[in-house]
Design a protein with these regions (language model features):
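Catalytic nucleophile-elbow at a beta strand-turn-alpha helix junction centered on a G-D-S/GDSL motif
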Residues: 1-11
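C-terminal accessory helical subdomains adjacent to catalytic cores in phosphodiester-
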Residues: 11-31, 38, 44-57, 62-170
Length: 170
């Protein structure tokens, strides 16, 4: 699996998934979306040993206009987009969210949702936060599936989790 993502928090989250599922996931952090092109994706993948079963995932926030159009131009990639931001996925582990929300409000709502999130910092998860995320994945998946893809709020991160679950069952 190849996961391209823009932020450090996403990298830390995917590293947690890689350790939990014990699956070969290559994480390619691209800080800015402006440089994501089909050619760049292929160049990055060429630096790794590839198999015919490899999948490409793009984990990006949709808080900037035109991001979605840029991502859709990358062939054979599964979009794991969050609107407005990655923290929505974390929030869905703790609570339902159906109405439109701004990025700052998602983070504030996450911090207020449960005591383990009170001191949430981007790009790091405490042991308790990791345990909570792994234990409540199923709940978050169901909540995410109930949202309209690419709209605010929504997240497609559950698609990666479902494929990892399938991979583990093989």
């Amino acid at each position: 699996f190849f996961v391209f993502c823009e932020g450090e928090t996403e990298v830390v989250y995917v590293e947690m998934l890689r350790a939990h599922f014990r699956c070969p996931i290559h994480i390619i952090a691209k800080k800015t979306l402006l440089n994501i092109t089909p050619a760049l994706v292929e160049r990055c993948k060429e630096t790794y040993l590839q198999t015919k079963d490899d999948r490409t995932f793009l984990m990006y926030d949709l808080d900037v206009p035109s991001v979605l159009e840029r991502l859709k131009k990358i062939p054979d990639a599964t979009l794991l987009c969050s609107n407005p931001c990655f923290e929505l996925w974390l929030l869905l582990h703790a609570t339902e969210r159906k109405s439109e929300i701004k990025t700052d409000d998602v983070v504030n709502e996450l911090k207020k949702s449960l005591s383990i999130w009170k001191n949430y910092k981007k790009s790091e998860f405490t042991k308790d936060q990791q345990t909570f995320l792994l234990s409540n994945m199923g709940i978050a998946i169901n909540r995410a599936k109930g949202l309209k893809e690419f709209q605010n709020p929504s997240t497609g991160i559950y698609k990666l989790i479902e494929l990892l679950n399938e991979e583990v069952r093989k």
